[in-house]
């Protein structure tokens, strides 16, 4: 059930940011923290979560040379920001926040 914005005066909000690029993620965390601090709310974070590393092994040759392989990896970086007492203005600021395209954001109450 979705609560109206008026019920967020004492809500706890968790923001989870994820990206393949650590530099974009740090830039986005700084933007989120700056907008939260403008509304004078207490915040914890950013909390660095473990980096998920996925390695893919691919044969270099399409037909022979099974011993010749190539490894590719994808690293996923995660951060969490907790807001303890959040107002409706803060929620609206977070919804209007402009983040880079490589960053995924989840806002949970």
UniProtKB/Swiss-Prot annotation:
It holds the Pfam family Ribosomal_S10. Its main location: plastid. GO terms for cellular component: chloroplast; ribonucleoprotein complex; ribosome. GO terms for molecular function: structural constituent of ribosome; tRNA binding. GO terms for biological process: translation. SMART domains: Ribosomal_S10 (SM01403). It comes from the Eukaryota. The keyword Chloroplast applies. Keywords: Chloroplast, Plastid, Ribonucleoprotein, Ribosomal protein. The keyword Chloroplast applies. HAMAP family: Ribosomal_uS10. Part of the 30S ribosomal subunit. Belongs to the universal ribosomal protein uS10 family. Involved in the binding of tRNA to the ribosomes. This is Small ribosomal subunit protein uS10c. It comes from Cyanidium caldarium. The lineage of its organism: Eukaryota, Rhodophyta, Bangiophyceae, Cyanidiales, Cyanidiaceae.
